[in-house]
Regions:
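Alpha-helix boundary/capping detector
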Residues: 71, 93, 112-114, 131, ...
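A conserved beta-strand-loop-helix scaffold within acyl/acetyltransferase catalytic domains
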Residues: 1-40, 95, 122, 128-131, ...
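C-terminal helix-cap and adjacent tail motif
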Residues: 118-145
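Short, cationic low-complexity segments
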Residues: 70-73, 140-161
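Active-site/acyl-donor-binding loops of N-acyltransferases
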Residues: 5-8, 85, 89-127
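Glycine-rich, flexible loop segments associated with nucleotide phosphate handling
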Residues: 36, 116, 146-148
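Acyl-donor binding region in acyl/amide transferases
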Residues: 17-107
Length: 161
């Protein structure tokens, strides 16, 4: 395993990142200019981990393909400075919805060690933009021609649907 991510549909339960927002995620997205979307079209990514930037690229491409296949319109994530730098390497233009502050949480959820020292932000982007950015970056890096990885990811995601 080179990378992993958790995914939560907004239609299933409140998103963890909604604790950082002053309003429901669908209202925050509309206020940020990302359009009005039903909760069934919104997804939260969490617990992202990768061994390398290349593994992150594959993960982003796979998740974007999966989210498109499942009909999600907007992806949300709480990203630290480091994660935002990784996203910027892939030319992902994310909208900031709010700062993620420990004081917005209650109980054990507040006790994340030094996590909040890395300036986490609640971010969002259209799923179509995420996939396009990942494909463009892979093309620029000549990844897909060397290994066929992106084509393989898309084919595998379609088989899962």
């Amino acid at each position: 395993i080179q990378s992993a991510v958790g995914i939560r549909r907004a239609a299933d339960a409140p998103l963890f990142l909604e604790q950082y927002l002053d309003q429901p995620v669908e209202d925050a997205l509309a206020a940020a200019g990302l359009g009005r979307h039903p909760r069934s079209a919104i997804v939260e990514l969490g617990s992202l981990a990768s061994l390398s930037n290349r593994a992150s690229l594959y993960l982003i491409a796979a998740m974007a393909a999966y989210m498109q296949q499942k009909g999600f319109a907007v992806a949300t994530v709480t990203g630290t400075r480091r994660l935002r730098r990784i996203f910027s390497l892939f030319d992902l233009d994310l909208s900031t919805l709010a700062a993620a502050r420990a004081e917005r949480l209650t109980g054990p959820a507040r006790d994340w060690g030094s996590y909040y020292d890395d300036d986490p932000q609640v971010l969002a982007a259209p799923v179509a933009h995420c996939f396009e950015a990942a494909v463009l970056k892979a093309t620029a890096l000549n990844v897909s021609k060397r290994s066929g990885v992106l084509d393989s990811i898309v084919a595998q995601v379609k088989e899962l649907a």
